[in-house]
Regions:
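P-loop (Walker A) phosphate-binding loop of NTP-binding proteins
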Residues: 10
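Conserved phosphate-donor/acceptor-positioning beta-strand/loop module used by diverse small-molecule
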Residues: 101-122, 160
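Small-molecule kinase domains that catalyze NTP-dependent phosphoryl transfer to phosphate-bearing small molecules
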Residues: 126-168
């Protein structure tokens, strides 16, 4: 059976870029960006922010349940699947529990120095409201992960410090 990868991390750590590059390494692969699935909601989408209400939690759960179904279908057809999703400090990505049971599942946390995420955010978004919104997400995720990384490693997560790395 082909591999399944979940790449997670804070905003602006290179999840999508890394996921695409990883998927290209396999002869038959698919990249599933969870943000793209969430953007399929045309009316009523709720974006993560300082206030996580039940509606947001429900939408994230629904997106991840659909991603799980996509992963199972593609993987059953012989595709290597690479998911990219942000680290969710509320659910700890337990919506993927079904996939976590698979022996071919690899959970990868991209964890560069926070300064690198901040720099990438500013370069990508420029100054302004979007950059500030993403910077807030970076602070929240890094605040949580600073103490959580050892637990994640014990749970089988591969933690990759990408501070001085690029996808090449």
């Amino acid at each position: 059976m082909a591999d399944i990868f979940l790449l997670a991390g804070a905003p602006a750590v290179g999840k999508s870029t890394t996921a695409r590059a990883l998927a290209k390494q396999f002869p038959k692969s698919v990249h599933i960006p969870v943000d793209t699935i969430r953007e399929m909601v045309i009316s009523g989408v709720i974006h993560p922010g300082g206030n996580w209400d039940q509606g947001l939690i429900e939408q994230l759960k629904l997106a991840r349940e659909n991603v799980t179904q996509m992963v199972i279908s593609y993987n059953k057809a012989g595709f290597t699947v690479v998911i990219d999703d942000f680290w969710d400090t509320n659910s700890l990505l337990l919506e993927y529990s079904r996939l976590f049971q698979e022996p071919n599942m690899h959970k990868v946390l991209l964890f560069p120095d926070q300064r690198v995420a901040d720099e990438r955010n500013l370069k990508r978004s420029g100054p302004g409201d979007i950059s500030e919104y993403i910077a807030g997400g970076i602070r929240i995720v890094y605040g949580h992960l600073q103490t959580e990384v050892p637990n994640l490693e014990r749970q089988g997560w591969i933690v990759v410090d990408t501070t001085d790395k690029n996808v090449d």
